[in-house]
């Protein structure tokens, strides 16, 4: 029953976020999230190195938005093409739903309504070949399995 309630909750959140899908996807916009082992979202790990590499190779070609727990921490790093936004705010949802590519290193919120014309790249923090992830877990609940079917 608990997993069914989570599933209904996720569907309600998807409906609430739907208006953001009315905005066009920006081909030059990249959104990044870096999960840091229970400490929140940070400018770190594999997504950070991809972000830095893209900025180095394609200077001023892309708008790069990082969804982080504390954007004030990165004020000194912000530039014309690099921005930090507080994660799980309306502003972060806007950038996530209008980016052509989203790069993350962990399982993103299962209720998040990514769009069909977006690319979601997951670098799987710490590798994945030796870890149980998502549906591979023996205790994967109903909501997790239902999301994987999508």
PLM features: residue spans?
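Active-site and donor-binding regions of nucleotide-sugar-utilizing enzymes
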Residues: 30-150
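Membrane-proximal basic amphipathic "stem/tether" segments
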Residues: 1-38
């Amino acid at each position: 029953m608990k997993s069914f309630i989570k599933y209904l909750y996720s569907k309600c959140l998807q409906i609430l976020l739907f208006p953001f899908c009315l905005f066009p996807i920006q081909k030059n916009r990249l959104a990044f999230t870096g999960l840091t082992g229970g400490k929140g979202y940070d400018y770190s790990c594999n997504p950070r190195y991809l972000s830095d590499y893209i900025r180095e190779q394609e200077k001023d070609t892309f708008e790069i938005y990082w969804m982080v727990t504390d954007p004030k921490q990165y004020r000194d790093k912000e530039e014309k093409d690099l921005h930090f936004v507080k994660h799980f705010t309306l502003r972060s949802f806007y950038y996530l739903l209008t980016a052509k590519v989203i790069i993350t290193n962990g399982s993103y919120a299962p209720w998040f309504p990514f769009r069909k014309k977006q690319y979601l790249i997951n670098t799987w923090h710490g590798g994945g070949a030796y870890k149980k992830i998502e549906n591979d877990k023996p205790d994967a609940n109903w909501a997790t399995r239902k999301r994987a079917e999508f």
